[in-house]
Structures are given as structure tokens and as C-alpha cells.
Amino acid sequence: GVYSCLKSEGSGKPAITRIALTKEQLKNFLRFISKSPMYSHWLPVMVVLLGTGLRVGECTGLTKNDVDLENNTISVNHNLIYRVIDGKADFHITTPKTASGTRTIPILYPEVAEQLRALIEVMDALYPEDLVMNGYHGFLFRNRSGYFLSAHNINRAIERISIAYNAEEMDQAELEDREPSLLPHFSVHNLRHTFCTRLCESTNDIKFIQQVMGHADFSTTMDIYTHITQENMKEKAEVIKGNLVLM
């Protein structure tokens, strides 16, 4: 099923339900993008978001200098945000609020390294004009006109891609006389939670999960981990129950 996490990041915020895509949904979403002539240009940013768990501003602010493909790491040291300052809406660079936000994370999925390597190779040809912001340059992710990508841009893309995928999947399922495997409604924040879910399913090293996710508070990581493992236990119990007979 789709996991829900009843914890918002950061203390003092109301509890919210946050879904994580299942492994099947994740695969279907990325495969659809990679095969789509209309949406394939969205593949690099979606793969990096889903494969690193970066916050959206950490990802859209990534520069060529933040990526070390020899050591398979990404340095997270600034955010790209879009907000109104002095009555003018524009992009700004901010630095992480807490020490845990500044971190070097391992690249865990080979697909992330592949997408980043390909992007770095073509970026000079793709973007002849370098964007410079607060001394940062060599930004990896740009919109169609070569400017910065916003969370709003990515959310609109997710929505359009999901609608297109679901329409195609419903037609295909009808042809094959089966139940369609549809994507739920989700946004860019669910991509981070999806990564965190896969990480929690793969390791019980809470400190490692906290460092990769950049959670300031250990209890945030612990709450998410506990919730995800409980959900998994429920699913496993249902499967096993069907096979157990005492008498």
C-alpha cells in the first residue's frame, strides 16, 4: 500500500499525512517519464529528488561544484528559494538554518550518478549563459528558458505527468483486462518522503538516516522510522497470516 507518515518535519508543526510512493509506483513514474518525448527532460531532476531525498531547494540549488562523482558524494550547503523580498518576487540563495542541514551525502543509487554525469557533460552546450547568484554558479537544473527551476514548476510537472500516466495506464489496463496501477496525487515533498521510506526499509541505522536526510532533530528521524517499520510490519503480517495454520 501507500505508506503515510503522520509527522511533519520540524517540531511544533501540526501532524500531517505524507504519502510515499510504493516501489511499483516509483518505477512506473520514472519509466513513463524516461519514455515520454514530452516529459523526458524532467527525468534528471526527478531521479535526483527521488534518489537523494534532498529538499526541493537543496536540489534546485545544486551546482556542478557540489557534485563529486569520483567519491560519489553530493555537498549540500545552500538552498535556492523563491520568495518576495522588499516587494519583489525572485529567487534567492539561503544557507541551511541548522548545522545538520549542511552535509555531504553519499550517492546511493547508480541512476543518480548517471543522470548527474550526463547533465554535467551537456550543461555548457545546453546553457551557454551561466547563471550566477550570490557567488554560486554552474547551476545544474534550469527551466525551459534557462532560468532557475522552482518547486511550483516541479509540482506542475508532477501533476501533468501523473495525469498523462494514469490516462495511458487506464487504457492499457482495459485492453489487458486487469486492474490499473494508478499513481496517487502527490507533490515534490512526497519525493523526499519516498526516498526516506526506502532508506528506512534498507537500514536500521537511525544516525545514518538522520545524517543523509539532514534532520536537525533525532526524534524526527526516529518518528518516521518507527512509523514506516510499523506499516511494513502490518503488511508482512497480512502476508504471513494467510500461510499460518495451527490446527
Segments from the language model and where they lie:
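Proline-centered turn/helix-capping motifs that create local helix->coil transitions or kinks
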Residues: 1, 69, 78, 82-85, ...
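Basic, Lys/Arg- and aromatic-enriched nucleic-acid-binding interface segment
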Residues: 1-56, 60-62, 70, 100-102, ...
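C-terminal secondary-structure termini that scaffold catalytic or DNA-interacting sites
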Residues: 5, 71, 82-84, 90-102, ...
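C-terminal catalytic core of Y-nucleophile DNA break-rejoin enzymes
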Residues: 15, 73-75, 84, 94-118, ...
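Gram-positive cell-envelope targeting signals
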Residues: 20, 57-61, 148-154, 190, ...
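Short, basic (Lys/Arg/His-rich) helix/loop patches that form interaction surfaces
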Residues: 31-42, 52, 105, 124-131, ...
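Short, polar N-cap/turn motifs at the start of nucleic acid-interacting alpha helices
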Residues: 66-73, 204-224
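Catalytic-site neighborhood detector that most strongly recognizes the C-terminal catalytic loop/helix
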Residues: 80, 194, 213-239
